[in-house]
């Protein structure tokens, strides 16, 4: 075996390791990662690795959520949770990209998409890191459906908030030298974050359930009606003993 062949064999990593390795790169050196996005370095490879990693992590956490009910619910949630985030991404990306262009941004669509995927990947990592906590409460409070639902809402909120922090930092770095319309783009980004959260919560409500209700047969989807926010309000009321959700 020649030295060059040995070198290739030594440095080549398995496909999965290459994709999941990007997680460590983001978490350890986020600003260096954002600088690479600004320079347009390996954007396609970055997007592919982050998409594979985040879909995998979302599927694993979705399976933990669905495990509260049945095997069918476990498999359903493992499929639907990645769909939720990917669908929300593609619904919301065009608005951020074109509004940013309108107010002077020079970012390409690939750069914008890569930064947003970074935020989604961070969210997926944090969700998966909370999976043992979710599993613990699943095993120790098996009959507390509303509590388990609120626990997951809290975990999603915290993980999503950290993802938004990464998104905000990433946009600032990638847009670093662009002064024209910088203040307006900042407010566009802030408003877009609220839109993204609203679309995501409504999307989740549309393709629910992710957690099967006790005593009910498996449902792939539920009938539309009500909304996410009122349901959370009633769930809080039931947990506090104020009333019972029917």
What residue spans do the PLM features occupy?
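N-terminal juxtamembrane cytosolic/stromal segments of multi-pass membrane proteins
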Residues: 1-51, 228-246
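Hydrophobic alpha-helical transmembrane segments
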Residues: 21-35, 59-71, 93-106, 131-145
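Long, intrinsically disordered, low-complexity regulatory segments adjacent to structured domains
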Residues: 188-192, 196-246
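Hydrophobic alpha-helical transmembrane segments and adjacent short intramembrane/lumenal linkers
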Residues: 80-83, 87, 96-212
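Helix-boundary and loop/linker segments of multi-pass membrane transporters
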Residues: 39-40, 70-71, 182-183
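A glycine-rich, hydrophobic loop/mini-helix early in the fold
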Residues: 45-112
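Sparse recognition of residues in long alpha-helices and their boundaries
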Residues: 45-46, 132-133, 223
